[in-house]
């Protein structure tokens, strides 16, 4: 079975699929690479443009680094990656900028929260935190860690996540290192250890969902949940080694999504990927792939190690996540070029069907105005039957009726908030359909426009080339 999956042909592109990347800020290893505010902003925009053009629809940006942050707060100090001086403001809000720029490109932005590790014992973040809470931080070597066995740890992290949720229009809260550190000598039973970690997750879930229940709560567990009947985890797994019951969190509704760190290949990858799929309980799973392992300074993996994993994950209905951004955008061994072709057809984020939320009403008064070069489509807003704060709109185009909204090749604009769009038609007769989508990803029934007349025939349109998030590319070529 596994061999058949690996050798199978490229799976059909699904309409719903998570295509994610971890954007790492610690030490500026992915971003930023300069302490100049102007340069930082330009670099972030360039990175997000590259990700968008490769079909990425989810950005996990490292927001809490090591008891330090990339947003203004009195809770913890600024991380030093922004200015070179921990505790010093860069003069703007990087998290807000990333959210705005992701949304402008039709991508989700999740705040990546490093939970238990708080950095060097005498580092700015750890030092300030242990001055406030001297009994909460444990020293192991020269590193500090929040104590997962103390209830105050869950309270603190829940309050921190609530602050991010309250202040920012993030699409997700993504928990990292939500487990016992591998260097921690666990003295309680594994069952009790799992309960301690689950208690923290429960507190964070309640804090986030009470404010904005549409926000996806996720984590990045160890890549192997536990030993399988035929395949062993070699002593390094989530459930037993570090008391991280990630599959149980999906089952019990504490998590909406998992991004397992599956930095493996062969039989260390495929059986465990299937295990995550079989225990996803209808939630989102998008395994992390080790694109960094292709670098000659790492393990020098061949490109086809990653591309086969991508194909198999798509075939079994899982998304994928790249670790980490710079190795991806640097096109290590051609991974960026491959992914851009692999994701040529756009994808929406899977809807949160487990919430039971009702889809919005259809849009009203859909109109089309045609000029010699473009169609302008406009509509009136739909009615949101959920508790979300605003609606998003998806636009589909086809040269035939009815417009098939189940075919992702027809998607030309995703997750846009505006109530109109201009589409270059290249002289062809196009039909359009518009759907409303709530913050849970539930999509309304489509409303279609009739064709707006016919002009002289031109070569067939490639709708995928038109997409640029919730905007459309102009057909005039741009030289780089």
Where are these regions (language model features)?
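Aromatic-lined carbohydrate-binding/catalytic grooves of carbohydrate-active enzymes
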Residues: 54-90
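Substrate-binding cleft of secreted/luminal carbohydrate-active enzymes
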Residues: 246-247, 251-269, 286-355
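Pro/Thr/Ser/Gly-rich low-complexity, intrinsically disordered linker/stalk tracts
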Residues: 335-388, 441-475
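Solvent-exposed loop/turn segments flanking beta-strands in beta-repeat/beta-sandwich domains
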Residues: 382-407
């Amino acid at each position: 079975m596994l061999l058949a999956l690996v050798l199978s042909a490229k799976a059909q592109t699904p309409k719903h699929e998570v295509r994610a990347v971890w954007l790492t800020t610690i030490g500026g290893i992915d971003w930023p690479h300069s302490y100049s505010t102007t340069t930082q902003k330009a670099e972030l925009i360039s990175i997000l443009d590259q990700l968008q053009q490769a079909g990425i629809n989810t950005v996990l940006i490292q927001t809490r680094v090591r008891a330090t942050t990339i947003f203004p707060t009195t809770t913890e100090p600024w991380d030093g990656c922004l200015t070179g001086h921990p505790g010093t403001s860069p003069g703007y809000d990087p998290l807000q900028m990333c959210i705005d720029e992701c949304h402008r490109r039709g991508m989700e932005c999740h705040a990546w929260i490093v939970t238990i590790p708080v950095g060097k014992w005498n580092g700015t973040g750890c030092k300030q935190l242990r001055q406030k809470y001297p009994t909460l931080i444990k020293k192991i070597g020269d590193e500090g860690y929040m104590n997962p066995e103390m209830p105050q740890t869950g309270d603190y992290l829940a309050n921190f996540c609530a602050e991010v949720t309250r202040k920012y229009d993030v699409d997700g809260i993504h928990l990292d290192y939500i487990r016992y550190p591998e260097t921690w000598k666990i003295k309680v039973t594994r069952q009790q250890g799992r309960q301690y970690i689950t208690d923290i997750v429960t507190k964070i879930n309640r804090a986030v969902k009470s404010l904005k229940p549409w926000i996806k709560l996720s984590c990045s567990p160890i890549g192997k949940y536990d030993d399988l009947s035929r395949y062993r985890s070699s002593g390094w797994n989530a459930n037993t080694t570090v008391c991280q019951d990630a599959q149980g969190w999906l089952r019990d509704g504490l998590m909406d999504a998992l991004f397992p760190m599956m930095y493996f290949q062969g039989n260390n990858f495929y059986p465990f990927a299937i295990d995550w799929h079989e225990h996803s309980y209808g939630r989102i799973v998008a395994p992390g792939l080790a694109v960094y392992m292709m670098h000659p300074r790492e393990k020098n993996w061949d490109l086809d190690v990653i591309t086969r994993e991508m194909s198999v994950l798509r075939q079994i209905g899982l998304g994928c996540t790249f670790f980490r951004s710079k190795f991806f955008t640097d096109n290590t061994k051609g991974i960026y070029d491959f992914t851009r072709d692999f994701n040529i057809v756009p994808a929406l984020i899977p809807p949160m069907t487990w919430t039971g939320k009702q889809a919005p009403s259809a849009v009203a008064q859909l109109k089309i105005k045609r000029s010699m070069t473009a169609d302008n489509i406009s509509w009136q807003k739909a009615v949101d039957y959920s508790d979300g704060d605003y609606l998003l709109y998806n636009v589909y185009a086809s040269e035939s009726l009815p417009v098939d909204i189940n075919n992702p090749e027809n998607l030309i604009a995703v997750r846009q908030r505006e109530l109109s769009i201009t589409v270059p038609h290249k002289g062809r007769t196009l039909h359009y359909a518009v759907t409303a989508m709530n913050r849970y990803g539930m999509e309304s029934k489509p409303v279609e426009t009739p064709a707006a007349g016919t002009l002289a025939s031109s070569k067939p349109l490639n709708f995928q080339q038109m997409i640029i998030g919730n905007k459309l590319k102009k057909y005039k070529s741009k030289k780089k």
